[in-house]
Every structure is written in structure tokens, then in C-alpha cells.
């Protein structure tokens, strides 16, 4: 068992990583006997894990209600969020309840936002079931719903009480979702840890076949990096923005193509190549390093080009609505070397459009 602490003073919390955590009531600390829980999951995961997690919580003396959401990025909406509030109010659940998010990024983000908002804030626990959510979205307290005009535009920073990562969940993950999660894994190597990127080049095949020790190390390293960044910059005023490598471009793809048509990791993968091409055009990143990124993404089965049917010009309106925009200027996360990156303002729209076009025609 691995345990990593996100250090935020009185709001610090553990990330527990191991196989078989769903069999142990103690995994779901700080829940105690007699407490009330609303377990939030989706229609795909409910048949796989709802009864098991409910059972282990009830074994610990916890009173469990549940709400099952539709599955898919297109359902990360205020309308679906309202079904969580309705379920809480119908019981009713008070301020002493705990929400448990059993699912991937959509379930985790919506549940966290519900917890931040319900009666002005109740406790919640993240139980991520996808690789993407285990290495990224479950850690750090970003919660949100999408809007038709932009991804994650309505939300709050609200930290969980704990994160429970059961590695066994990856055994039921569809291959496309596993590959999508690898985009966020590769991101950490590009922005923060060149040695980890080297390790990924050497161990990618083991990750694709769900090798236990390799996957455990991979998830632990990603969570360590994320925990360090969040502890240093919880509300994304500086360092934490680096975690958005590829996301300014990727969110544009998701919004333009319709949420769910491109998985988040797929869009981020293409976006990371666009960021690398932008950095190349600025003369601060080598084509050889861009090629290393492209090669690793391709080996993982991820796209390295944007959608053929989406013109370079179609990215700009979405990018100008990005949450990192300041004073009307797009701020981009750009690699400087494998393992080092920066937040860059003032890049001309023409250069950005040319970098996108590089990826469209590649």
C-alpha cells in the first residue's frame, strides 16, 4: 500500500493506492460508524462496483444512499448536477453527510462540485476508477460542470477528505479509456520530470498490458507530482497552471467536436503536440524533442493531430474563453525541454494558428 499526503494545513488529506481497497472498510477513512453517505456513480460502473462499495461501507456501520448518473462527458452538466442535489434533498441529507464519488473524471468533478455547493459545503471522498482520474482529476480539488460554450467553466476549488485508488478498477476499464488516461501520465513527464518521461519510454508496453508493479509505480509517481504542485499552488496562480499542458488546445477540440466524441485524454494528447509545435516555432523547443513526444503518444495509441474537420481558426474562440486568459490574452503552457515547461503570454495568434496547422497536416 502506498500513501501520499496532499499537504494543505488543516485541509491535508491522504491518497491511498493499492489493490483490494474495496474489500477494506478502513480504506474509506475518515468515515465512521453511524455517519451518512451519498454514493454517486454512473450507469456503467454501478453494476460493477456499487454493491461492493456499498457493502464495505455498511460493514463499517455507515448509512448509504446512492444516485446513479448517466455515463459520458456530455452529461457533465448543470442539469445532471441537479439530480445529485435532488437526491440529497429528498432523503434529506444534512451538513454532516459525506458524498463519495465512485467513478472517473465526470463523476468526480460533478460530485465534488455538489459537495462544494450543497448546504454551502459538505465533506466528500474521491474513489477514482479510471486511470485519468487516478493520476490527475481526483487529486487537487478542482470541481466543475461543463457549459456548451466551454469545458469546466462553472465550478469551485474544493478539496476531498481523502482519495482512494483501488488499482483493481483498471481491470474493468475499456482499452480506449486506459489509453486516454496515459495522455495525462505522459503530460507529467513533459512538464515536470524528464526522468519519469524516460521511464515511460522504457515501460509503456508494461502499462498497456496493466502490469501491476509498473502501474502502481506510474500512478504513485503522478500523484506525488500532483500533490507537490497542489501543495505549492492550490488555486492555480502560478506553478499549478503547468498541469494544463495541452488543455487549452484540447478543451477547444472537446467543445467544438461535442463533449464525448473525443475523450479528454485524446484531445489533450493532440493539444500537447500543438503546444510543442508552438514552442518550436518560438525557437525554444527542439524538433527532436517534439518527435520524442509524438513517438510516445503514438505508441500509446493516442492521436497526435487535431480533427481533420476542425480548422485552425475554429480553435481561437474556444481558446479565448480559456480559464487561463488574462486581460484578453491567451496564456499557453509550453515545453522548454522534456521535464521543463513555462506559462507563456503574448504569443501571436498567427503563430499559434500556424502551429495548429502543422498538426493538422502532419
From Swiss-Prot:
Belongs to the sugar phosphate cyclases superfamily. Dehydroquinate synthase family. One of its GO terms (biological process) is amino acid biosynthetic process. Its cofactor is Co(2+); Zn(2+); NAD(+). Pfam families: DHQ_synthase, DHQS_C. Catalyzes the conversion of 3-deoxy-D-arabino-heptulosonate 7-phosphate (DAHP) to dehydroquinate (DHQ). Binds 1 divalent metal cation per subunit. Can use either Co(2+) or Zn(2+). The lineage of its organism: Bacteria, Pseudomonadati, Pseudomonadota, Gammaproteobacteria, Enterobacterales. It catalyses: 7-phospho-2-dehydro-3-deoxy-D-arabino-heptonate = 3-dehydroquinate + phosphate. InterPro entries: Dehydroquinate_synthase, DHQ_synth_AroB, DHQ_synth_fam, DHQS/DOIS_N, DHQS_C. Coiled coil: none annotated. Its main location: cytoplasm. NAD(+) binds at residues 71-76, 105-109, 129-130, 142, 151, 169-172. It comes from the Bacteria. This is 3-dehydroquinate synthase. The keyword Nucleotide-binding applies. One of its GO terms (cellular component) is cytoplasm. GO terms for molecular function: 3-dehydroquinate synthase activity; metal ion binding; nucleotide binding. It comes from Shigella boydii serotype 18 (strain CDC 3083-94 / BS512).
